[in-house]
Amino acid sequence: MSSVGPLEDEAAGTELGGSPADPATLTEIDPSAIQVRKTRTVVKLDCERLVSKKGLPYLLKNAPKHARISKRRDTYGNLCHVLQFYQLWAHELYPKAKFKDFVALCDRLGKTDRQLRAYRMQLIREELGLAAEGLDPPPQPLREHTGAGGSQPAGSVAQDTNTNADLSDDDLLYTTSRAAAASSTANPVPRSETPAALAGVDEAELLAQLAEMQRAAEEDVHESEDDEQLALMREMDEFM
């Protein structure tokens, strides 16, 4: 049995009409050439993404409709329904992070980003009716609170101001809501007050008014539920 060498293979290929492999025709790879790779775009959760069409505007538009509390479900079922809506929204907006991390990022951005804080105050003004008139409440100096015994010392006023400055918007909202409720009980505000009369309030008073409105809405909901339960009990008594 005879072995065929490389020279004989090349000669046989030439006789069959083929051409031997030319080293010059082979593509040579330059080791010094720089290979440019396309980098993936890193998606970050920032103020621009939160105020985009799929961000907070989508949440404000669809949350009252899709995250509605139903009387047919129990408390646990309603909580799961609301939580599922927010989880789907968070995954659609920023799928890279888990829901718990997404909430932490939103909380941090809400306390540090100035544009996001301004957007939030704009929403509060729109809900209170100040933005409809195109009014922007100007900053006011500190007002001395007088009680039955006379004027309050200046040191205590400065201490209260420093305490409120250290609080975030969320903390200030719940801190000032009780004081606003007590003041509204002592000195009720007339219903004929127009949005133009509210133009001189600061951010703390805006947050307090918003908290008072939310508390009144919750009380109305509870009263309506109690009335419906009483009506059902009366119907049951009639049948019995």
Curated annotation (Swiss-Prot):
Keywords annotated in UniProt: Cell cycle, DNA damage, DNA repair, DNA replication inhibitor, Meiosis, Nucleus
Pfam families per the UniProt record, alphabetical: Swi3 (PF07962)
GO biological process: DNA repair; DNA replication checkpoint signaling; establishment of mitotic sister chromatid cohesion; maintenance of DNA repeat elements; meiotic chromosome segregation; replication fork arrest; replication fork processing
TM regions (residue ranges): none
Primary location recorded for the protein, binned into one broad class: nucleus
Region entry Disordered, spans: 1-28, 132-169, 213-240
Subunit text: Component of the fork protection complex (FPC) consisting of TOF1 and CSM3.
Family affiliation: Belongs to the CSM3 family.
Known role: Forms a fork protection complex (FPC) with TOF1 and which is required for chromosome segregation during meiosis and DNA damage repair. FPC coordinates leading and lagging strand synthesis and moves with the replication fork. FPC stabilizes replication forks in a configuration that is recognized by replication checkpoint sensors.
Protein name: Chromosome segregation in meiosis protein 3
Natural source organism: Eremothecium gossypii (strain ATCC 10895 / CBS 109.51 / FGSC 9923 / NRRL Y-1056) (Yeast)
